[in-house]
């Protein structure tokens, strides 16, 4: 692994705290998105009216925090390991980052494969999180949710929607890493020099690199989220069912019984959450990496 990018512990710690910060700040958006997707007749206004207290907006924060912080730590460590292996012998870096620079197809593949692998590992937490956030299950805690799924559906219940999740997360992550790395190269050239500060070696200062990385993350996440939105709706519907429902069956039901537009339910909320989450998580990740290096 490239020494410039730090060792595995640095990526684990940086990814963990980046993911944790983003989920604590943005959990209300995730909860509203889940409830908006669970029923075809819902509107954001009606979902908000059903929220009884402000505290309820943070329902499911614990499983979300576990999934996102652990998932981010594992994903970013695996992503860096695979990218560093492909970049071995190369010293190419962008001005705002310690991460290795790869060709576009390599960014696409490493992002997609790393996310698919970590997504399967964290799938049980994801299922519990979605059930906990919805209004269809009145769980009083994670232990109760875990026992109920195990007793009623068995081990298979913890991996419900795995195919839809992989079809959503792998393309999203691949597109995101590709776009993110390109944006980090383009933004310093596109922005006025007065907005950017650099040291004697040409590397951007901490405030400038944080701005470039944050804006790059926001823009990349916005586009990747829009393109993969239908898979998110299908995944949520599958995970909320107590009986086995397939990917194709769920897709056919939404398109034929409801309307194709339903596939994009919750997009505005997911767009806000994913874009801001990427901005927070990747911004913290990249800057913590420099401090720990």
From Swiss-Prot:
InterPro entries under this entry?
Hem25/SLC25A38, Mitochondrial_sb/sol_carrier, Mt_carrier_dom_sf
Q: Which UniProt keywords are present, listed alphabetically? A: Membrane, Mitochondrion, Mitochondrion inner membrane, Repeat, Transmembrane, Transmembrane helix, Transport
- Which cysteines are cross-linked by disulfides? none
Swiss-Prot/TrEMBL Solcar repeat ranges: 6-85, 102-186, 208-291
Q: Where, subcellularly, is it found?
A: Mitochondrion inner membrane
Transport recorded as keyword: yes
Q: Which reaction does it catalyse?
A: glycine(in) = glycine(out)
| Any one biological process term the GO annotation gives | heme biosynthetic process
Q: Which Gene3D superfamilies match?
A: Mitochondrial carrier domain (1.50.40.10)
**What's the stated role of this polypeptide?**
Mitochondrial glycine transporter that imports glycine into the mitochondrial matrix. Plays an important role in providing glycine for the first enzymatic step in heme biosynthesis, the condensation of glycine with succinyl-CoA to produce 5-aminolevulinate (ALA) in the mitochondrial matrix.
Its family remark reads: Belongs to the mitochondrial carrier (TC 2.A.29) family. SLC25A38 subfamily.
Q: What is this protein identified as?
A: Mitochondrial glycine transporter
Q: Which organism's genome codes for this protein?
A: Eremothecium gossypii (strain ATCC 10895 / CBS 109.51 / FGSC 9923 / NRRL Y-1056) (Yeast)
